[in-house]
């Protein structure tokens, strides 16, 4: 079932214009591309929010929508505002009206020609084995960084000369239409700067930067995990003013076939023979640091968990050490020789199991029989 424009803006069907405007402001701010870069779902929702506002803020379109639905609006031709911005003069005005100077008009949003084409910092993904992440290690890594082009002063233009971008006319934004809705998007030709090279720099091929290689030895601390970042000072990109940013090393730790890691705790499922569980024997259990002894209680149950304190991972920020949790899985023999079968039959009889039924099972059947009689 298609969601209605009122549901998109989270308002009722009798909402007045002020309520619609406030709802649009809230939803547009939530899903705006500038706040959700790279999020395709947020981008799609932002388009729907704009589409809903375009219709509900226009009395004629809203009346048609309320009576006939969205299909009646296809093809355009409704209302006097053909720009698609709900009565605002340009792409930037709709955002400055709702969000203030932080979004500003299209002319204020335009990037300066002095802006850097590259960020000062960047992220380097480093893959580690399970053991390397748990215990720490030394790693020599080779990486590529960007350096602002000296020839064109980072502009990407020959001799550093730029002209007004013909696609966006210097605004830094262009209008993109979807159906009868038009919304603002960063100009793909000038990346929002409003300026473009008439002729590309021969040195950097119009990119505004060149790439160089570097290497560094890293001391990976004990206890790092996937998603953690280590900052390496002054190993980032080099900007126009010759300052160098930082490199952030993002850890990607591999999983292990035996041990399961959850922050600083280690989990392991360990097989236990049924006689060991019944008798409560001592067993040897592997940990990340070697074998330890686990004393099973008599009658240990399948799936029962036991905590081995301080047998987990050392916390990367402190001296605390996690635990290892051992979950036992009770195993039964799948085949028996004659001697084993005879022994088990005798054991079964010694527990009072006759006619294929244990005393507790008989008691349960008797209870059920009495339930039917009552």
Curated annotation (Swiss-Prot):
It comes from Campylobacter jejuni subsp. doylei (strain ATCC BAA-1458 / RM4099 / 269.97). One of its GO terms (cellular component) is cytoplasm. Keywords: Chaperone, Cytoplasm, DNA replication, Metal-binding, Repeat, Stress response, Zinc, Zinc-finger. InterPro entries: DnaJ, DnaJ_C, DnaJ_domain, DnaJ_domain_CS, HSP40/DnaJ_pept-bd, HSP_DnaJ_Cys-rich_dom, HSP_DnaJ_Cys-rich_dom_sf, J_dom_sf. This is Chaperone protein DnaJ. CDD domains: DnaJ, DnaJ_C, DnaJ_zf. Belongs to the DnaJ family. The J domain is necessary and sufficient to stimulate DnaK ATPase activity. Zinc center 1 plays an important role in the autonomous, DnaK-independent chaperone activity of DnaJ. Zinc center 2 is essential for interaction with DnaK and for DnaJ activity. HAMAP family: DnaJ (MF_01152).
